[in-house]
Each structure stands twice: as C-alpha cells, then as structure tokens.
Regions:
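Bacterial N-terminal signal peptides that target proteins for export
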Residues: 1-12
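Acidic Gly/Asp/Thr-rich repetitive segments characteristic of extracellular carbohydrate-active
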Residues: 21-51
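Extracellular beta-strand-rich, repetitive "passenger/adhesive" scaffolds
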Residues: 41, 60-65, 87, 115
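Extracellular beta-strand-rich solenoid/capping regions of secreted or surface-exposed proteins
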Residues: 46-57, 66-110, 121-129, 155
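Extracellular beta-strand/beta-solenoid scaffold signature
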Residues: 68-76, 96-104, 119-125, 141, ...
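Functionally critical loop-and-helix segments that line ligand-binding/catalytic clefts
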Residues: 237-239, 243, 252, 265-274, ...
Length: 423
C-alpha cells in the first residue's frame, strides 16, 4: 500500500473508534475499524486506492482528499450499510476497459453524501446495488473532449436508489441500465452528452432536475413507465440535439416540464411500442425549439393535453410522408393558432391544423433543411399557400385548441420566462 501525502504536521493519526488508534495509511485506519465505527482521518491528501468492505462511517470533515494517483478506481465500496461523507475523490486511472472511476459501489443501504469527485474517468459506477442514497455529490470529470469522457454516474442492475441534489458537469452520460424504481431528483446536469439516459430501465422517476447544454437532455430507450415531471430541459442543440427522446418506449408520463431551446423538443421513434400503454404529455411548456415535436414515422398512442407550444420554428414534424393524425391532441395551446373564440370560453371555435406546403421539401428530404428559414424556401411556401401546385397534406389537427396557455404555463406566472431560460 502506497504511503499517503498529508498536509498535517505531526505523525499521529487520529481515528474515532472506541478510542484513538495509530495507523500508517488511510486503508489501515479503515481495516482496523469495527463495524459501525466512525473513521475521521486528519486533514490531508491520501494517495491511495481505498477498499471499504464493512459498514463503517468514513467522514472527511477535517478536509480529506483521496487521490488515486492516476491508477485504478479511487474508492471501492463493497459492503452494505456504510456511509461516506465530506470527501474529495480525485485522479482515477484512465482505462475505459476497466471502468476506472472515482467511486465504485456494490452493496445496499449505503449513504454517499457531500462528496466531490474530480478529474476521474467515470464518476460513480454502481453495480447490483439497491436502496442506496447519493446526495449532494459534485462530479466534474475534467475538461476532456466529449469522446474522451466517462459517464458521470453509471447504474447497472440496481433498483430503488435515490440520486438527489447532485451537481454534474462536463461528463458524458448519466446512464441507467436494467434498473427500476430509482428516483432522480433535484440534480443539475450540464454540458454532457446524454443528461440522463435510460436503457431497458423501467419505472424510474425523474423530477425537478435542471439539464442544460447537453447533446440530449433525457432519452428513454426500450424503457417503460418512466415518469418525468417538473424538469427544466434546456439548450440541447446540434444536429441531433433532443430535449426529451423516446425509442420504442411505452407508458411514459411527461408532466409539467419546461422543454426550451432545443433542436428538437420531443423526439418519438416508434413509441409507444406497446399500444396498450400510451405515452402521456401534459402541462409541458415546449418553447423556442427548432422543432417542437418530431415523430420519426406515422404512429399512434401518444396523448398531448394542456401543453403550450410557443415560438417553435416548426411545431410538429413527421419524417417521410406520414402524419400525426392518429395521435391524441386535446386542449393544447399553439401560439400560431389563427382561429377565434366567439363564445369566449377559452377554446378555439375552429380546429388548429398544420398543413405541409413547401415545408414538406425538407421534411421528406432532410438535407433541404439547410434552406429552412431562408428567403427562397419562405417565398416558395408563400406561393404554395396562395396557389398550391398540389394538394397540401394535413399533418395534424386539434379540434379544441386553447386560446391561451394553461394557467400554470403563462410566462408571466412562471418562475422564469422561456426566454430567460435560453440565456
């Protein structure tokens, strides 16, 4: 075991057990601790790769940094009922094949809180671990190009965990594989690839998170019964930028989210896969996106109600020659609705309809989207609307659109306006 480097003067190491114990390394302190003991090392930087295999409390409140020295995973936790808190973990190895991380967890009912993980390949790697709590963890894996980063948090066959109040920046993905009933709440995730990515992971809840400047905000791939509510999903730009995406996923409940400033606000690639379990989108603000909702094909089983579609360059896009006529549209607000409300009941008296005129050029030939927003395509669209060369295709229809956004989604009543979210 390599010796540690400490900023503390003196040679006596204190540990809170039944009484003070002298030890040569942090690993020695941990190994000497009885089950349930609290280990409080002196302040300093300990250059070691630590293994915790019994249920202690490791508290770095004095100012403890554990440095992996660029080798392997910094801390390996293979036990149940342990607590790690008030620590800094840094400088893991850099081998993707070994998944070198700041912290590896394999166990149940552990609590990891108030920990900073920096300059590591992966942040936290969690395997076959249930009922753990990860709270107030800061993960900054380093200013690497995106393709050289590891995942901030990787969850593998792990259920009933809580991830709360964490701050993640400049990592690759927060990815959940084959895991159920996890709660991801009140986290800040910035400048990654997938903010949160579910793979074959069912019945998880994502709420009150702020996900900004990622390539993709939240993506569900073969993941059913996911709940997304009260999240801010902002500024997923680039050619493949997606706010919320689905791939063959069913039974999602997407409520009260702000999906603002993305290339594609919502992306649906045949979802729901199970026709008996529709996806529900209710009370969302879908604003200032390049495309509000993109359907990869003509599909059915998605129900949209009480949403506000505001200043999207294109409200709805269906690739190829399909339509969104089989989807459910009920009581949404569309800011480009040109109808009227003669009886003043708040509901438009004529349907909201989207027809494809010149737009179908870039919808059917994606490379033509280069000209979208330009004078030539705008002029062609105007002429098509004035005197169509051929019958335009009806893309979608809502029979009872709202004249104004639902009360909760009125910009003046929101904590932040949609424009402020873009800044």
């Amino acid at each position: 075991m390599r010796p540690f480097i400490s900023k503390v003067y003196g040679a006596i190491l204190a540990m809170v057990l039944a009484g003070p114990v002298l030890a040569g390394t942090l690993q020695d302190m941990i190994d000497a601790a009885a089950d349930g003991a609290e280990v409080v090392p002196p302040a300093g930087t300990y250059v070691e790769n630590i293994v915790i295999d019994h249920n202690i409390v490791l508290d770095g409140r004095n100012g403890v940094v554990i440095d992996g020295g660029g080798v392997d995973t910094v801390v390996t936790l293979k036990t149940s009922g342990a607590t790690l808190k008030n620590l800094t973990l840094q400088n893991s190895g850099r081998l993707f094949t070994e998944t070198h991380a700041g912290l590896y967890v394999e166990g149940n009912y552990n609590v990891i809180r108030d920990v900073r993980i920096q300059n590591t390949l992966f942040g936290i790697n969690i395997k076959q671990s249930n009922n753990n709590v990860f709270r107030r963890i800061t993960i900054f894996t380093g200013a690497q190009p995106l393709e050289m980063r590891g995942d901030s948090i990787r969850v593998w066959y792990s259920n009933d965990n809580k991830f709360e109040d964490n701050d993640i920046q400049d990592a690759r993905d927060f990815v959940i594989w084959y895991s159920a009933n996890n709660i991801i709440r009140n986290n800040r995730i910035r400048n990654g690839r997938y903010g949160i990515h579910f793979m074959y992971a069912h019945s998880n809840t994502v709420e009150k998170n702020e996900i900004t400047d990622c390539v993709v905000g939240i993506f569900m791939m073969y993941a059913n019964n996911i709940v997304l509510r009260d999240n801010q999903i902002l500024r997923s730009w680039g050619a493949s930028g997606i706010g919320v995406g689905f791939k063959e996923s069913s039974g999602a409940k997407v409520y009260n989210n702000n999906i603002v400033g993305n290339a594609f606000g919502i992306y649906l690639d045949p979802s729901p896969w199970d026709p008996d379990h529709p996806n529900t989108f209710e009370g969302n603000r879908i604003a200032y996106n390049g495309v509000g909702i993109r359907f990869l094909n003509d599909w059915t089983g998605n129900n949209f109600s009480d949403n506000s579609f505001l200043s999207n360059f294109t409200q709805v896009l269906v690739n190829g020659r399909g339509t969104a006529m089989r989807e459910g549209w009920n009581g949404n607000h569309w800011d480009d609705y040109a109808g009227f409300d003669k009886d003043k009941d708040g509901v438009g008296d004529v349907p909201y309809e989207i027809y494809n005129y010149a737009d179908r050029l870039w919808m059917e030939v994606p490379h033509a989207s280069f000209f979208r927003g330009g004078f030539a395509l705008a002029a062609l669209d105007f002429v098509e609307r004035l005197a169509p060369f051929s019958e335009p295709r009806l893309l979608m229809r809502e029979t009872a659109p709202l004249m104004e956004p639902p009360e909760r989604l009125k910009v003046q009543d929101a904590p932040k306006s949609a424009l402020e979210m873009l800044q």
